[in-house]
């Protein structure tokens, strides 16, 4: 029995965000940014479960959700909420962040705390894959693979569910 995988890699599947990677207990990158590109692969049900017209679902259903989701991370600072060395204090207008000997203050609407220990492409792709799978499994999507590229030719992908 055959299955089909839909490939979505639109030019507007992108977001620009600032972050820094934490390598170990002494080393971390400086705050910097990337223009990320995203590709999403959706494994559809078996061919017998396609519409009588021979297609799975209108691509626009997926494209709209993916684009809206990526827009949430566009022009924003992404920080790892679960790293033990990250300390956060919310004030009326800002988020104060202490990381080891560094201090930052960001406007509240310009920072997102992610439920991860590092803001690597590995973790970003995993968060997006989990989110897209939760959203799309109701349509019959069997598996989601998300590839996040931070620079041309350099990125990571995650697959949900794994098997």
What function would you assign to each model-found segment?
Residues 1-163:
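Charge-rich, low-complexity N-terminal segments
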């Amino acid at each position: 029995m055959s299955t089909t995988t839909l490939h979505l890699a639109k030019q507007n599947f992108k977001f620009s965000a600032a972050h820094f990677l934490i390598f170990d207990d002494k080393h971390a990158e400086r705050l910097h940014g990337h223009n990320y590109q995203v590709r999403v692969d959706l494994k559809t049900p078996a061919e017998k479960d396609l519409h009588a017209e021979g297609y799975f679902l209108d691509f626009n259903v997926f494209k709209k959700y993916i684009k809206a989701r990526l827009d949430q991370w566009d022009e924003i600072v992404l920080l790892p909420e679960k790293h033990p060395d990250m300390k956060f204090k919310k004030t009326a207008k800002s988020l104060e962040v202490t990381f080891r000997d560094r201090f930052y203050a960001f406007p509240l609407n310009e920072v997102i705390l992610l439920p991860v220990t590092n803001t690597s492409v590995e973790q970003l792709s995993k968060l997006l894959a989990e989110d897209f799978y939760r959203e799309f499994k109701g349509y019959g999507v069997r598996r989601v693979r998300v590839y996040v590229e931070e620079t041309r030719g350099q990125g990571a992908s995650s697959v949900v569910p794994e098997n």
